[in-house]
Design a protein with these regions (language model features):
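Divalent metal-coordination and catalytic microenvironments
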Residues: 15, 72, 97, 143, ...
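Active-site gating loops and adjacent loop-to-helix segments of metal-dependent hydrolytic enzymes
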Residues: 21-57, 114-115, 120, 174, ...
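Active-site-adjacent C-terminal substructures of enzyme catalytic domains
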Residues: 199-323
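Metal-coordinating catalytic core of metallo-dependent amide/deamination hydrolases
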Residues: 87-211
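Alpha-helical scaffold segments that flank or form the walls of functional sites
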Residues: 26-102, 126-135, 357-359, 365-368
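Active-site microenvironment of metallo-dependent hydrolases
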Residues: 290-370
């Protein structure tokens, strides 16, 4: 039986890491194999981000932006980390997104984990520089923090000051793993949410990724403060950090991929599967997360000059057989067609993948040497 073509609003990836797009191109396994989440960070992702340079980041950004559009994702809310290439890194991401016609909300995730307070200051300075100078109509900037357990109270407080100075919000990892909670308690706080609130680091409208280890009472506090949460079910399952079972109490929860490909229908399916055993989640929880992501994107682009808002972004699926996955045929962002007949309008996917393979082969030796 044939399914007719259909039109849906563009998808929003509410939390991702564009810099990870080269990982499928032969990233070597961690050695020795990690046994917990912090070891996954230390042996995989923190080594990868330290190995990034301008060329590898550009190849990653161009590929991720292009492939996202082919999945029907029209807005990326990204969290960048590249300690060896901080200054100018957000321009690399922004240029790639503007090139292919995808919306993006960008930040650099400031952290003290490698170079102490000076590293944190440089990350915040990159956010400030980018927000002040960005003129791209499809790109907005916010302030970023990695996760509170990698930051001093001074860096957290300074990040909040920068956000208020620039009249913007924060994008931060929140209670992804128990390590974040335990670190906050060792510092005298009830948890990472309370720590960030105490250091005045979360302006209303801020985006907190994960929230796996928040209690329902904490999620209610977050909602009352006007804070967004971005749930990342595939990543949380893959990293074995648990299911974010308390997020059901908030109406401000969107769906992200945490660096996985921006295939939001696949993320939707993962959330449906993982939430099936929850006594609290409503049957339409996954669908509501997708809708909420569009509300979040509209909030971040409200009043942006030079382009129509994300509310009009559209994806058209081609007609096809019921037993076959739906195929994206056409994608429109800000009134411009960026995918037509299933192909990029502004680039060649195979050329982008070839460049990604080339840069990946240079990246892995740098990563192994760290």
């Amino acid at each position: 039986m044939t399914t007719p073509s259909r039109t849906v609003p563009g998808f929003v990836n509410a939390h991702t890491h564009i810099y990870s797009a080269l990982a499928p191109y032969g990233m070597p396994p961690a050695s020795p194999p990690p046994e917990n989440f912090v070891q996954i960070l230390e042996r995989v992702w923190w080594r990868l981000d330290r190995a990034l340079d301008e060329r590898s980041l550009r190849a990653s950004a161009r590929l991720y932006a292009a492939e996202s559009l082919l999945y029907g994702t029209t807005t990326l809310i990204d969290h960048q980390e590249s300690p060896a290439f901080i200054e100018g890194s957000l321009d690399v991401l922004a240029d790639a997104c503007q090139e292919f016609g995808i919306r993006a909300v960008l930040c650099y995730g400031a952290t003290d984990r490698n170079g102490g307070r000076e590293e944190g200051r440089r990350g915040l300075a990159e956010c400030r520089r980018f927000i002040r100078g960005n003129q791209r109509p499809l790109v907005r900037g916010v302030v970023g923090l990695h996760a509170s357990f990698t930051c001093s109270d001074e860096t957290l407080h300074e990040a909040g000051e920068v956000a208020r100075e620039l009249d913007t919000v924060m994008h931060v990892h929140m209670a992804e793993n128990r390590a974040d909670v335990e670190d906050a308690r060792k510092r005298g706080y009830e948890g990472p949410l309370e720590r960030l609130l105490a250091t005045d680091s979360l302006p209303a409208g801020s985006i907190m990724a994960h929230g796996v280890h928040l209690e329902p009472s904490q999620v209610r506090v977050a909602e009352s403060r006007g804070l967004w949460l971005a749930q990342n079910p595939r990543s949380n399952e893959g990293n074995r950090v648990g299911y974010a079972s308390s997020l059901w109490v908030s109406g401000k929860v969107a769906l992200g991929t945490d660096g996985w490909e921006a295939d939001m229908p696949k993320e939707f399916a993962a959330l449906e599967r993982l939430s099936a055993g929850s006594v609290h989640e409503e049957v339409d929880a996954a669908a509501r997360r997708l809708v909420t992501g569009r509300v979040l994107a509209a909030e971040r682009f409200a009043g942006a000059p030079g382009a129509a808002g994300p509310e009009g972004d559209q994806v058209i699926y081609a007609a096809g057989e019921d037993d076959q996955p739906a195929q994206v045929s056409r994608v429109t962002v800000a009134g411009q067609v960026v995918v037509d007949q299933g192909r990029l309008v502004h680039g060649d996917l195979e050329e982008l993948r070839a460049k990604a393979r080339e840069e990946a082969q240079k990246l892995w030796p740098r990563m192994a040497a760290l």
